[in-house]
Amino acid sequence: MAPPAPRTLSFLLLLLSLHLTASSKLNIPKVLLPFTRGTRVNFTLEASEGCYRWSSTRPEVASIELADQDERQCSQRAVVQARSSQPTRLTSIIFAEDIMTGQVLRCDAIVDIIHDIQIVSTTRELYLEDSPLELKIQALDSEGNTFSTLAGLVFDWTIVKDTEADGFSDSHNALRILKFLESTYIPPSYISEMEKVAKQGDTILVSGMKTGSSKLKARIQESVYKHVHPAEVRLLILENILLNPAYDIYLLVGTSVQYRVQKIRQGKITGLSFFFFLNVLYKFLTTKKF
C-alpha cells in the first residue's frame, strides 16, 4: 500500500492538532488563595492532557512550580502558591503552553485577605457512638467570594460550653474532636501531615460521646487574622433509634401491627428496647370537590 501523499499527511496532522487543542482544558479558570505571612497555601492546577511549560506573570504574587516534571521540562500538573507580601487583593496570570501543539491555557491566580470564616457540614446532627461527622472551614473575602483552598492553614478548634442548651450542664462533654489518624477515613494529604505535628487544619472529625447539644468554635491561628471572628456551629447528639419495620404500612380498620424499637451503637443493634402495638380503630373519610 502506497504511503499517504504529503498533503494528506499534513491534513491528518492538522486534524490531530485541532483535536488536541479543542480537548485540552484546565481544571479551574480562576483560583482564589488567602494571603498569609507564615504558611504557604498551595493549589494544584492540572490540564486534561498534554505536557505543558508553566509560567506566572507575577511570581511575587503567585508562583508556579512543576509537579511530576519529566526530561522535557514539562508537566501536566503544576502547583500555584500564594506569595504576596501585601495584605491587599492582587492577581497573577498563570500560563500553560503545550510543548507539542503550542496551545496556551490560562488561569487567574488571585491572592486576597480572609474577611470571614464559617463551618460547613452535611448535617448538624450526629448519632451517639456512630460514624463521625466531618466539619470543614469555608473562608470568604470582603465581597463574599469563597477561597479555593485553605490547605496548610492552621486553625484552633475547641469545644465550648453551649449556654443555650437548657438542662445539659456538661454539654461541652457531649462531643470530642477525632483525628483522622484515629479513624477509618482518608483525609487530604496535607491534613495527615498536619496531624503528625499536632496541628489542626481546615477539616476535622467530631464524634458524639453522650446525648445533648454541643458547640464547636474554630479560629485562624495566624496572627494577621486575629481580627477575624471565630466560626461557631451547634451540633445535636442523638441516640440512634430504629423503628422496625421502618417502611410504610397500610392497615385496615380493626387491625394492628407490632413495632419494635431498636438501639444502634457503632453500627450494631445493641438490643431491643420495647415492643408496642399500633391499632387502627377509626376510619377517616375524605371528600373531594370537583
Predicted regions and their residues:
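Extracytoplasmic soluble-region selector
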Residues: A2-F290
